[in-house]
Amino acid sequence: MARPLTATVDLEAILQNYRYAKKLQPTCKAFAVVKSNAYGHGAVEVSRYLDKEVDAFAVAAIEEAIALREAGIVSPILLLEGVFEGEEWALCEKHGFWSALENAQQLDELQASHAKIEKVFLKLDSGMHRLGVDKETAPVFVSALKDSGQVGEVVLMTHFSCADDLSDLTTMQQLAYFEQARQSIGEIEASVANSATIMKWSVPEGGWIRPGIMLYGISPFAEVSGRSIGLRPAMTLSSKVISTRKLKQGDKVGYGLGYVAAEDHVLATVAVGYGDGYPRHAVNGTPLKIDGKPASLAGRVSMDMITVRMQDLADEPAMGQDVVLWGGDVPVEEVADYAGTIGYELVTRMTSRPHYRYIRGEGSQ
């Protein structure tokens, strides 16, 4: 017998979300961003399912990329953070990786390595101030990369700070800065669009888009679910009721006795906790479903368990009943909101303890 906690991942939903991203920006090629274990969905399984259709994959670092190559992935793979040590350029050449480049040290190390790289994505700091060169320096970097004889093509890339906030003018300012840099360089392919940008902003035609969170059916925008904006949520996290007990009015539950029964009712204990990735800071009232009926968190989240109550106390929970923690009509975005965080964090913090089950177009495994 196994602990009844399962993350069911709909791979076909991820593929359809990728196709939707390309439909929204039809002149662009698209990465499938599978960093951080495909946002907690399983990078190898997701990439294997998408490999025959995607234009390329994108990950954060070289160890993620090597793991995909070792799993048989043949599509191009971009390192979004570039290399961290000069020796990694040789590995990029060996495995055919593309890489971001954002500073003089990386450029010097590339030139010293003599490695041949098909595509280098030069990171422009258009205002986020994490990584990248400025618009005055960008033409110098592009010339150096082209003159090195080591790089097949240079792409100019940037990242937007506030694309998920349609009322914020920062994105327009960053786009203008990017275009100024691009014009000073001359003809060069562009990559500017993350999920929020793909869905709501105009981007340069013919470049590369980088759908990330939207691939997994999760909204990049606050206060709306992925399903409500045309995405297909890919993950359902489910478990079972493993114990029930009758509470009397005034009984207190859990660590810190953080839940007090306002009336007599049946309490259910469910096999999931923060040791699995369920958010410890989820508050009383966080939604879930038991046997298809609305229920909510009642008491502090433990490492391995939570305690819950039915919304309608006449619906008494029973041992072995199915529990949906998020997915379906329990949006992960809503659960995240109750925990004071975002859907990105919930899925990427999934641990190795849940059993993963993958649904494909023609069946399941």
From Swiss-Prot:
One of its GO terms (molecular function) is alanine racemase activity. The modification N6-(pyridoxal phosphate)lysine is found at K35. Its cofactor is pyridoxal 5'-phosphate. One of its GO terms (biological process) is D-alanine biosynthetic process. SMART domains: Ala_racemase_C. Its EC number is 5.1.1.1. Transmembrane segments: none annotated. InterPro entries: Ala_racemase (IPR000821), Ala_racemase/Decarboxylase_C (IPR009006), Ala_racemase_C (IPR011079), Ala_racemase_N (IPR001608), Ala_racemase_pyridoxalP-BS (IPR020622), PLP-binding_barrel (IPR029066). It catalyses: L-alanine = D-alanine. It is an enzyme of class 5 (isomerase). Pfam families: Ala_racemase_C, Ala_racemase_N. Catalyzes the interconversion of L-alanine and D-alanine. May also act on other amino acids. Belongs to the alanine racemase family. This is Alanine racemase.
